[in-house]
């Protein structure tokens, strides 16, 4: 039997909606990364963008286990001497763009290259419940029901 290799015309992309309310960040990010890459499909082809389009809502309500909310820090450098800066995940979640925490977590689970960048373009993350993709009729994926560890109450 020959190995299946999809052609661009055979790729079928679906739209998936995930509610991040109360979900653990790392477990959520790994599910999103798998869906973006298309590894959940039997027709997965490593060199093609065969993953689905993923919409994540309620990004500000994502949970972090342990002390990661204050201990995990995103660093960057301004380019000036002594210009190292940093913000904790908690500060970012409480700030203006809480969706960046999910985007960064998924970005680090997807390959770094031209294909990975194209796959990351299929991810849309929104802080609240509203999203402009109702016309695509996304199907809801319940990540919390997959494993009890995926959801945190407190």
UniProtKB/Swiss-Prot annotation:
<comment type="function">
    <text>This protein is one of the early assembly proteins of the 50S ribosomal subunit, although it is not seen to bind rRNA by itself. It is important during the early stages of 50S assembly.</text>
</comment>
<keyword id="KW-0687">Ribonucleoprotein</keyword>
<comment type="similarity">
    <text>Belongs to the universal ribosomal protein uL13 family.</text>
</comment>
<dbReference type="GO" id="GO:0006412">
    <property type="term" value="P:translation"/>
</dbReference>
<dbReference type="InterPro" id="IPR005823">
    <property type="entry name" value="Ribosomal_uL13_bac-type"/>
</dbReference>
<dbReference type="Pfam" id="PF00572">
    <property type="entry name" value="Ribosomal_L13"/>
</dbReference>
<protein>
    <recommendedName>
        <fullName>Large ribosomal subunit protein uL13</fullName>
    </recommendedName>
</protein>
<comment type="subunit">
    <text>Part of the 50S ribosomal subunit.</text>
</comment>
<dbReference type="InterPro" id="IPR036899">
    <property type="entry name" value="Ribosomal_uL13_sf"/>
</dbReference>
<dbReference type="GO" id="GO:0003729">
    <property type="term" value="F:mRNA binding"/>
</dbReference>
<dbReference type="InterPro" id="IPR005822">
    <property type="entry name" value="Ribosomal_uL13"/>
</dbReference>
<dbReference type="GO" id="GO:0003735">
    <property type="term" value="F:structural constituent of ribosome"/>
</dbReference>
<dbReference type="GO" id="GO:0022625">
    <property type="term" value="C:cytosolic large ribosomal subunit"/>
</dbReference>
<dbReference type="GO" id="GO:0017148">
    <property type="term" value="P:negative regulation of translation"/>
</dbReference>
<keyword id="KW-0689">Ribosomal protein</keyword>
């Amino acid at each position: 039997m020959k190995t299946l290799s999809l052609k661009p015309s055979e790729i079928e992309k679906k739209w998936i909606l995930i509610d991040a309310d109360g979900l653990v960040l790392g477990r959520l990010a790994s599910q999103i990364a798998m869906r973006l890459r298309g590894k959940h499909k039997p027709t997965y082809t490593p060199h093609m963008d065969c993953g689905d389009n993923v919409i994540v809502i309620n990004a500000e309500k994502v949970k972090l286990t342990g002390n990661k909310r204050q201990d995990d820090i995103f660093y960057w450098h301004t380019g000036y001497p002594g210009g190292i800066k940093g913000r904790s995940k908690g500060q970012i979640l409480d700030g203006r763009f809480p969706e960046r925490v999910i985007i960064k977590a998924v970005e680090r689970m997807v390959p770094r290259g031209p294909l990975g960048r194209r796959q990351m373009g299929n991810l849309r993350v929104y802080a609240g419940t509203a999203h402009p993709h109702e016309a695509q009729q996304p199907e809801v994926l319940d990540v919390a029901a997959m494993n009890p560890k995926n959801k945190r109450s407190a």
